[in-house]
Amino acid sequence: MAKGIKEMKKDLEQAMFEDLGRCHFWTELAEYHGLLDFISYHSDMLDDYTKEIHTDPALLWIPSTSKVRYEPLGVALIMGSWNFPYFVTLKPLAMAILTGNCAIIKPSELGPCCAKVIQIIVEKYLDKRCFRVIQG
């Protein structure tokens, strides 16, 4: 997904300008770099998120062992907002991807150009069996 965001930077900025009148500088600062930094940081932390955690068992169960294993829960529904359409929509999508979940993405209908760019990124760069965008 980060690759798609980088490749579609100009489209992201143009759609934001058409929908909200937001200048390219602010879009790049608040949405583009913030999102890429978020994805980069959490991608680096993936091993910490997925490793088993061994804990001390309850007194009743000694000498057994206890551990916590994190597993995907299923499908996430991500509802986007109109004021920060990329960050608020693609940030939870990145976390769904990193945690192994599928997602249904519903961008805001108040920003149709941004919603279309989100749909292009999802359809072009992510697995169509796991991630769907619903417009409207």
Regions found by a protein language model. Name each.
Residues D56-G136:
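Rossmann-like NAD(P) dinucleotide-binding subdomain of oxidoreductase/dehydrogenase enzymes
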Residues M1-S64:
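N-terminal Rossmann-like NAD(P)+-binding subdomain of aldehyde/semialdehyde dehydrogenases
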